[in-house]
Amino acid sequence: MTDNLFFRLIQNAVGTADGFGPVVPSAEEWSAMNREAQKQTLLGVCFAGVQRVCGAHPEQAVNLPAALKMRWLGAAANIQKRNEVMNRHCVELQEMFDRDGMRLTTFKGQSVAALYGEELRGLRQAGDIDVYVECGREKALEYLRKKDIDNGGWDYVHAHPKIFNDAEVELHYRLSISHDLFKNRKIQEFWGSHVADFFAGKAELPCGEIVCPSDYIHLFYLLHHAFRHLISGGIGLRQMMDIYFAILRRDAGMDARLMKDVNDMGMTRFASASMWVLRTVFALPEIPSLWNADEAEGQFLLNEIMAGGNFGHGDTRFRHPTSRAGKLVEIARRNLHLLSHYESDALAAPFYYIWHFFWKRIQICRMWFRRRA
């Protein structure tokens, strides 16, 4: 019952529902909705739902504890302040790289928040700042070195430069990866053939303009990103909400192409499951030109989302070790229950991390020899 109320609260926030129907949530149910919003990193957006219910149907909010409402209000205000900081840093990054003649685009994060609309964009809980720079790994690391910026550690996909004291930055030189090394070759070729689309959009933030991907690439990327994190640790409803707003923003004339590209990357089952989740949680209407909602796969995906929370951080079914070996063992153990749904990707994930361990050491050796030459 609480899950249904929580979904209804989300629907009030995004404008697909009006109140809770005949139900008047109890104080305990309001507290449970608040806890779930925290777990899913949707506190800010859900507070917009609280405000709508209180404004349009005050009789349904009579059991909302005043102290809880004030804490929720405070959390939403802090989220808005955090978004102001992140927006400013995104514009600063754009200006810095523009001055240095390097093409940079912001994806996920603040550029996705721009899809939420004026009322909700400031209430999306920000994580880090994800940007892509069109120069490759070695040039990106060399750029940071010349700017005297600590790269913060790097891998196959991105570095973590220490540019701001109050915000984490992921500087991507590859947009994303697949854990299946055969699929990874395909996805890198796909990104390579769509580089122009990475820089085709503009996002108007309150403090300035940033470059972002086209709506098409944004939606494809968000699906791929969510699928990858499902395999490597888990996803939450914030990732689903990003996909929801990207679907609303999409050019429907590109739907056939989107379905083909998603199928080519082996993600059709996940996309069909996601459509069921979006219809159940956000009341997304049926879209004949996109995937049919798969209830069986959707139920499995939603169970994973509700059990794990944001990126699986709230999942109590599995351990969360800190050592590399421990993480590898836990990923393998966790992915056993994914085998009947996403076979090749679930099997490939542990081997990807083993491959990456040796790949990085080879790259370090190559960089050392080049500097010595």
Features from the language model and the residues they span:
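Conserved NTP-donor binding/palm subdomain of two-metal-ion nucleotidyltransferases/polymerases, i.e.
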Residues: 1-127, 132-373
